[in-house]
Regions:
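DNA/chromatin major-groove-contacting recognition/catalytic segments
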Residues: 175-207
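Short, basic (Lys/Arg/His-rich) helix/loop patches that form interaction surfaces
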Residues: 123-164, 168
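Flexible interdomain linker/hinge and immediately adjacent N-terminus
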Residues: 1-20
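Active-site/catalytic core of tyrosine-dependent DNA strand-transfer enzymes
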Residues: 83-135
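Alpha-helix N-cap/helix-start motif at helix boundaries, enriched for small hydrophobics
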Residues: 36-37, 44-53, 162
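Conserved tyrosine-mediated DNA breakage-rejoining catalytic core shared by Y-recombinases
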Residues: 52-86
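A short, basic/aromatic helix-end/turn motif that makes direct DNA contacts
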Residues: 52-58, 163-170, 178-185, 190-191
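Basic, Lys/Arg- and aromatic-enriched nucleic-acid-binding interface segment
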Residues: 17-45
Length: 207
């Protein structure tokens, strides 16, 4: 990619900042925010993909893993294995919200959530966390996705594997080279095995 398309090493949140963000949603007992942030951070879903998620996308692969069967993009279908911790959280959320079909995430008007809704949701947390110096800067949904992809690569996945999983064109994977080479980020390389804690989430909370 062009030089200006290569991400600087400080473009993404480090592991401590990610933990602070998830902890803030966790402490607020905000099921929706916690799950949305987790889907970006752990699975690298785009904002658009999260907003378009339907109950019907959830399935099991031939080995019994819980998956999202994503709609074809450029004639390519993707089956994304859902990590166990997110799968548990997703099951609890769907059950608590009584989602039988259609959109998994709704806005306050009970319509499918829009990309601007998720950005506002994230901003409501980043504003507080920046003020309390628990985040260095305001991050966007795209920034969190960059973090997810970077840590997948740091965790040992090949560029081709990550590109296929996240739906990114392979030639753009080089944009993460500077981040991967960063000593600061590599100190947090154990991010890829961080498990999302579920015990404190209130399953009865409805928004």
């Amino acid at each position: 990619p062009e030089q200006d398309k290569i991400l600087p090493k400080d473009a993404i949140p480090d592991a401590r900042e990610i933990d602070n963000l998830l902890s803030a949603a966790f402490d607020d007992n905000d099921n929706k925010a916690f799950l949305i942030f987790s889907l970006v951070i752990k699975m690298g879903l785009t904002n658009q993909e999260i907003c378009s998620l339907n109950r019907e996308f959830i399935c099991h692969d031939s080995e019994g893993h819980l998956c999202f069967s994503m709609p074809p993009k450029n004639h390519i279908s993707r089956f994304l294995i859902i990590p166990d911790d997110i799968g548990t959280l997703l099951d609890r959320y769907i059950d608590a919200e009584n989602i039988q079909s259609g959109a998994i995430f709704l806005n306050h008007r009970k319509n499918r959530i829009k990309m601007r809704d998720t950005e506002r949701l994230l901003a409501s947390y980043t504003q507080k966390l920046v003020k309390s110096r628990k985040l260095r800067r305001h991050y966007t949904m795209q920034t969190l996705r960059h973090a997810a992809i970077s840590y997948m690569l740091i965790g040992g996945a090949s560029k081709d594997e990550v590109a296929a999983y996240t739906g990114v064109t392979g030639k753009w994977m080089n944009r993460y080279d500077r981040i991967i080479a960063s000593d600061v980020i590599n100190e947090a390389a154990n991010y890829n095995i961080i498990n999302i804690s579920l015990s404190g989430i209130d399953n009865n909370r409805h928004e």
